[in-house]
């Protein structure tokens, strides 16, 4: 049975070739589950991006997380980068209004709901980050998904900052987190993935646990219980590579 409200389909993360994200999103949508299609400007020019968005609408996928995309190493594949994440949000809005960028009219246009990514730690340490998020919201972002965060104090400070600025009034904010399976996994993530800060205390809980998988799920569940009533926190974006069953168990606690 369906547990999550929607699921994200990633777009060649870490700049590695993966199964076409729109194909996967289409199959999931056909099963009856709602989908958020992640779309990067890294690999596609304007024509290719418009084609993906039209294709998404044709199969009932109308939520798009607009990303710049992980960039390759110096000797990696050639990138396009014609569109930034901001540019992708604007493109979604143009298509929602019924035209392509060259003015071509779209028959029976449908709305696209673009989303933006955010990093809580950047928001709290770099004054310019809030204005960048505000710009994305002004350009039409309907929702925000943040990077992983496992610290209540950081999430509360982020929530208070958004509330004070009023910058998220017109969109939904989903805080990112996920069940960690081991201290080793958590340590690797904080060293290698953008925007992630996992405290030594959490790693210690996992390392000393007789059942680290259960402990990782418990950490998530308890954090969700603390943040669901914060202002400007509208939901949770659970990320659990190879932890889909654990993520489902966490969600089930709140149904």
Residue spans for each PLM region:
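Short, acidic/polar
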Residues: 1, 21, 46-53, 124-135, ...
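Aromatic-anchored, glycine/proline-accented short structural segments
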Residues: 129-181
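Conserved, mostly hydrophobic/aromatic
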Residues: 7, 56, 136, 140, ...
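Structural motif
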Residues: 2, 59, 139, 230-231
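Active-site-adjacent beta->alpha loops and helix N-cap segments on the catalytic face
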Residues: 15-27, 45-52, 70-104, 125-128, ...
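Catalytic beta/alpha-barrel core
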Residues: 6-17, 39-40, 65-66, 142-151, ...
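Hydrophobic or amphipathic alpha-helical targeting/insertion segments
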Residues: 54-66
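Active-site pocket-lining/capping segments in soluble small-molecule metabolic enzymes
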Residues: 81-109, 117-122, 165-223, 242, ...
């Amino acid at each position: 049975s369906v547990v999550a409200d929607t699921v994200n389909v990633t777009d060649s993360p870490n700049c590695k070739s993966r199964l076409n994200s729109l194909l996967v999103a289409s199959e999931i949508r056909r099963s009856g589950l709602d989908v958020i299609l992640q779309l990067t400007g890294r690999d596609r020019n304007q024509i290719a991006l418009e084609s993906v968005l039209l294709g998404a609408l044709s199969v009932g996928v109308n939520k798009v997380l607009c990303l710049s995309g992980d960039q390759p190493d110096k000797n990696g594949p050639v990138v396009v980068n014609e569109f930034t994440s901001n540019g992708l949000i604007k493109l979604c809005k143009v298509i929602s209004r019924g035209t392509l960028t060259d003015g071509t009219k779209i028959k029976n246009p449908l709305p696209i709901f673009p989303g933006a990514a955010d990093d809580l730690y950047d928001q709290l340490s770099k004054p310019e980050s809030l204005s960048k998020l505000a710009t994305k919201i002004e350009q039409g972002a309907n929702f925000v998904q943040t990077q992983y965060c496992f610290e209540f104090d950081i999430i509360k400070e982020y929530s208070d900052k958004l509330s004070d600025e009023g910058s998220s009034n017109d969109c939904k904010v989903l805080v990112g987190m996920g069940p960690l399976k081991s201290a080793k996994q958590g340590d690797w993530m904080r060293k290698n993935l953008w925007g992630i800060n996992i405290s030594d205390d959490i790693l210690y809980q996992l390392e000393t646990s007789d059942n680290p998988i259960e402990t990782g799920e418990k950490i998530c569940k308890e954090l969700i219980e603390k943040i669901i009533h914060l202002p400007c926190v509208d939901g949770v974006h659970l990320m659990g590579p190879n932890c889909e069953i654990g993520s489902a168990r966490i969600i089930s606690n709140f149904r």
